[in-house]
Amino acid sequence: MKRPDYRTLQALDAVIRERGFERAAQKLCITQSAVSQRIKQLENMFGQPLLVRTVPPRPTEQGQKLLALLRQVELLEEEWLGDEQTGSTPLLLSLAVNADSLATWLLPALANVLSDSPIRLNLQVEDETRTQERLRRGEVVGAVSIQPQALPSCLVDQLGALDYLFVASKEFAQRYFPNGVTRSALLKAPVVAFDHLDDMHQAFLQQNFDLPPGSVPCHIVNSSEAFVQLARQGTTCCMIPHLQIEKELKSGELIDLTPGLFQRRMLYWHRFAPESRMMRRVTDALIDYGHKVLRQD
């Protein structure tokens, strides 16, 4: 059985994290040539490439497995050394989360853990349909995802669901939907997506109004908070989690354009097994808080 030298594996990790050999060398305080040599040693050991030398570099499938192993070893090593208790070295936790969870429930869920424990969070924001891939690639140690199935050597628990409502300001509704929300009116009403892969509004409009993808004008804005602002100022209609706009709905600043119609996204918490004590605390905090504020039916 091949056992990697973790010093060489850290070189591979640095190249991926720093998006290149030069910055990886600076991070590790060694020469760029030394970084290349360490990665070459790993590749010779496993008899296959571990890095696709693109810009930025990315790991091969075998490289992803080794990086995932490194994440697990780092967490368990920190715990074994007792750093979690002494606080001498804050533990780095890289998590992949969707923007809507980050804007609503995730930070309150982790509040006590963050205040009581020596943790440095590295939250990598990704669409909930793609966060699990970051865990698969070994870029993170945990992920909030819509995927219910656990990856090999991982654990998964259901957190609860976010219900997305199709909302806008009263002024927007009066301008674009004076006779109600109809298929023809929707063709002229601008919507907003997080990125070009965000298809939530497309799925909602296709399912409920038989509108094919790309048939309505769409802004691209990489911010959950900006969705709320765009809706409040009457610029767009948006799919926004009910949890995020409870006050605006109650005050009438925003209105539900399609009462009774919504998109539900069930969320799951994925992480490597076995869990360290610190990761178990994170898991418990996310599950407990998720069960309080997210839909469970």
Swiss-Prot record:
Which GO molecular-function terms appear in the entry? DNA binding; DNA-binding transcription factor activity
* Domain HTH lysR-type, residue spans: 4-60
Annotated DNA-binding ranges come to 21-40
Indicate the secretion signal residues: none
**Superkingdom to which the source organism belongs:** Bacteria
Q: Does the keyword Amino-acid biosynthesis apply?
A: no
Q: Which Pfam families match?
A: HTH_1, LysR_substrate
Q: What keywords appear on the UniProt entry?
A: DNA-binding, Transcription, Transcription regulation
Q: In which family does this protein belong, per the annotation?
A: Belongs to the LysR transcriptional regulatory family.
Q: How does it assemble?
A: Homodimer.
HAMAP family named in the record: HTH_type_ArgP
Query: What functional role does this protein have?
Result: Controls the transcription of genes involved in arginine and lysine metabolism.
What is the protein name for this chain? Answer: HTH-type transcriptional regulator ArgP
Q: What species was this sequence derived from?
A: Klebsiella pneumoniae (strain 342)
